[in-house]
Amino acid sequence: MRIALCQCNPVMGDLAGNLEKLRRIVRSTAPESPELLVFPELFLQGYPPRDLLENAWFISDGMRSLEQLREISRTRPETAILVGAAFAASGTARKRPTNAAVVVRDGEVIFRQDKSLLPSYDVFDETRYFAPARDVDVWEYGGERIGITICEDIWCSSDLVPEGLYERDPMKQLAEKGVSLLINIAASPFHVDKQRQRVS
């Protein structure tokens, strides 16, 4: 499977600008004919959106951006587009949005995986803004059984997260479901020496 990793820097709160970046990338990757384009965590809204998520208009605007993404995907019907977005709560029981990985192809949302593990330590306060995933699912595409995780979901059993912080392990759940390919989308806040830390 040909996958294009679309590493780019969205601007927090600039939904129109972020969508335009995505549109340009969708167009510019056409000659390579990837079957899947992968964008970062919360790409549509920018990361970290924090208190913007407290505004109903911001969530509504994000869902409208997702509708526009569906239209953009029609220009490349052979390519699936995986993008991070704050997804509006469904029903009345869940008022907080989810931090979601949404897959769109040929005008349709064909898969969605919400983030399972919401960090609330150090600079992170995601439990305040988001509802966690209820489960992890497998996406079958291009002959693969794909597990999609979002940032913290992949770190549950690593030395980077305090032991016992989370009750479930999405990686273990996906392994038990027999995934053949794992995709993790992530974003993290900038700080001084971040690039040096990433390289080392």
What is each stretch, according to the model?
Residues 1-200:
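Enzyme catalytic cores with a strong preference for nitrogen-chemistry domains
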